[in-house]
Amino acid sequence: MTGANKEQSGQIKILLVDDEEGYVNVLAKRMAKRQVEVMIALSGAEAIQTLRKNDFDVAVVDLKMEDMDGIEVLKIFKKMDPELPVVMLTGHGSEKAARDGLALGAFDYLTKPCDLEELLATIIKAAEQRSE
């Protein structure tokens, strides 16, 4: 979605990638109330297919997933859409991997469970960067 489309719709469109279905459903419902349109992918493979078919302002990707880790997803996303800001989510103890993600082009990382306001602020900042 281009910056102009985002301005017309008033929403930020994100791809939320995490294999914890309950967690992402709660986040998606809470973000929808804040003018954030969320598409959910419950695996890395599903995320790649979803990105092929849709445009997003930001991707939010968990580092630890069953089928492929968030670093692999980040690398593929950056090949598919080099300008897509990717925010990594990490559990305690995997911050080194998140920093590795930053070195590979991730926009930022947050530790789970993350505060919704902090996540939204990071998403908005990332979307603004994309629309510049």
Give the location of each predicted region.
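Short amphipathic alpha-helix used as the core "switch/output" element in two-component signaling
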Residues: 49, 71-83
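Non-catalytic signal-transmission and effector/linker regions of two-component phosphorelay proteins
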Residues: 1-13, 121-132
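Charged docking surfaces used in two-component/phosphorelay signaling
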Residues: 25-33
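Acidic catalytic/metal-coordinating carboxylates
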Residues: 43-46, 69-72, 93
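C-terminal output helix
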Residues: 96, 114-124
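Receiver (REC) domain active-site loop signature in two-component systems and cognate sites
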Residues: 65
